[in-house]
């Protein structure tokens, strides 16, 4: 094993042989469930935004050269930049069982921490290869924490993409942190926890809004530094900033925290509903809430109006990729006048998305899971104006004359909150404008 720098309820349906699609019911609306061939992106991708967020953490992937090349390409960094992630590459002797994987991990970690003494939190990240040969990273993390715990905490999680969507890498990472969160004192005042990785600028915006409402005790998970892990307890109320954090939410609830039901903070409507859930839970009066949120709502509404001419009346089709599909469809339909033909999602968490589902029009087809060939047939037949899909489908669809938007770009870009509402709308408008310019 060599070290190479930077090259549930929340789980999607397991893949299987293609079968006839089945219809279920989600609330009072039909839901198309599909099982078959599906396209996914690797869960290791979450490291790209997580390593930028937790500034004293390091992510050590136990994987293959393919993992190393993926990370270098996805992150857009060079080896000499020494980013805070790397791949311990499984060699032939590791795969053949000729070397003790646990000893090799110990050796690589010791070298890493000697070279990078600034690391305070080390994640051992499982991959498809390490899971196939069943390397016990949880045992390795417990052992290494005893050895290096005075200076560096060691935690493990799986970033494998075998049966998950790429955003669930973040879910697995945050869920692994929850057991290490300190316990809040029983007599402490209620506090608010925002769960899900947000760009620092967005986190600061939300922090200011909560403070202006009088919610002073606000924390974010993940924090910017591992030494600032938030304390949680029965008086903790948490808001999910991302819809793909089912495991993390379940772990927080097991420790006594309570989730605040809310739509997700995309666009004016979603952001206002999300903030209102916190305001109601912490006793903020309506006058204060309206005063604090009015400037942001007005700025966002003006920004959205600039994109409405491009998007209004256009038809959009979502392939399942990130679990962001339902909140984004709600945003496009209700705030920009688009028509959603099909909203595909890898997994539909009914409780976490209840507020979003209530806002969707009954005409939109919801689909859970995927049989990619059948879904492509439906997409081609519908001829939508815009398709939101993964990288693997985008180029073939573009070659057929169908305009596409890469779904992964919606995860990498700041899109939450009032100030980013216009940017979010522009991400969808840009492919349509490009297509119009290319027409002869």
Swiss-Prot record:
Which SUPFAM superfamilies does the annotation name?
Helical backbone' metal receptor (SSF53807)
**EC no.?**
1.3.7.7
Which pathway does it serve? Porphyrin-containing compound metabolism; bacteriochlorophyll biosynthesis (light-independent)
The alphabetized UniProt keywords are: 4Fe-4S, ATP-binding, Bacteriochlorophyll biosynthesis, Chlorophyll biosynthesis, Iron, Iron-sulfur, Metal-binding, Nucleotide-binding, Oxidoreductase, Photosynthesis
Catalytic reaction equation(s): chlorophyllide a + oxidized 2[4Fe-4S]-[ferredoxin] + 2 ADP + 2 phosphate = protochlorophyllide a + reduced 2[4Fe-4S]-[ferredoxin] + 2 ATP + 2 H2O
Region called Disordered, residue ranges: 1-24
Cofactor(s) it depends on = [4Fe-4S] cluster
The record's remark on the cofactor is: Binds 1 [4Fe-4S] cluster per heterodimer. The cluster is bound at the heterodimer interface by residues from both subunits.
Per UniProt, where does [4Fe-4S] cluster bind?
A: 42, 67, 128
Q: Tell me where the signal peptide lies.
A: none
Q: Where are the transmembrane segments?
A: none
Q: Which GO BP terms sit in this record?
A: light-independent bacteriochlorophyll biosynthetic process; photosynthesis, dark reaction
InterPro entries attached to this UniProt entry: LIPOR_BchN/ChlN, Nase/OxRdtase_comp1, Protochl_reductN
Coiled-coil region list: none
- One Gene Ontology MF term: 4 iron, 4 sulfur cluster binding
Quaternary state and interactors: Protochlorophyllide reductase is composed of three subunits; BchL, BchN and BchB. Forms a heterotetramer of two BchB and two BchN subunits.
Q: Which family is this protein grouped under?
A: Belongs to the BchN/ChlN family.
NCBIfam families hit by this protein: DPOR_bchN, PRK02842.1
Functional summary from the UniProt entry = Component of the dark-operative protochlorophyllide reductase (DPOR) that uses Mg-ATP and reduced ferredoxin to reduce ring D of protochlorophyllide (Pchlide) to form chlorophyllide a (Chlide). This reaction is light-independent. The NB-protein (BchN-BchB) is the catalytic component of the complex.
Protein name, per record: Light-independent protochlorophyllide reductase subunit N
List the source organism. Answer: Rhodospirillum rubrum (strain ATCC 11170 / ATH 1.1.1 / DSM 467 / LMG 4362 / NCIMB 8255 / S1)
